[in-house]
Each structure stands twice: as C-alpha cells, then as structure tokens.
C-alpha cells in the first residue's frame, strides 16, 4: 500500500510540474511577441516633431527646434 501511495504522489507531482511549465511557456511567447513589436517600431520622418526618446529615420533630432533633421556641416 505504501509503494502505491508513493507512486501516486510522484505521478501527481510530475503532472503538476508539466502543466505549470506549459503555462509559463505561453507567457514567454507573449512576452517575446511584445518585444518584437517594440523592436519593429517605425521611425519619425524628417521634419516631424521629435524629442530625446524619438527615433528619427534620419540620424539627428534637433532638440532646439524639436524636429528630425539631417545634420548640416559648415
């Protein structure tokens, strides 16, 4: 009887662990998709408003005018 009880408890633990890991895997997939959507964020075109956190399509955000601009060299 004791052996049967030990086997039953072991089986319950394995089943619970398997179910829990599936739930976590779904959670990871959602997190991964969210990260991918943040990485594919579009850039702000030249002439549009920007700030220190804006990703301009061109490499420069003029914080004085708050517009995405191409840098001018003298």
Curated annotation (Swiss-Prot):
Its main location: secreted. Residues 19-40 are annotated as: Disordered. It holds the Pfam family Conotoxin. It is found in: Secreted. InterPro entries: Conotoxin. It comes from the Eukaryota. Expressed by the venom duct. One of its GO terms (molecular function) is toxin activity. Disulfide bonds join 43-57, 50-61, 56-68. Residues 18-40 form a propeptide. One of its GO terms (cellular component) is extracellular region. Keywords: Cleavage on pair of basic residues, Disulfide bond, Knottin, Secreted, Signal, Toxin. Belongs to the conotoxin O1 superfamily. This is Conotoxin AbVIH. The lineage of its organism: Eukaryota, Metazoa, Spiralia, Lophotrochozoa, Mollusca.
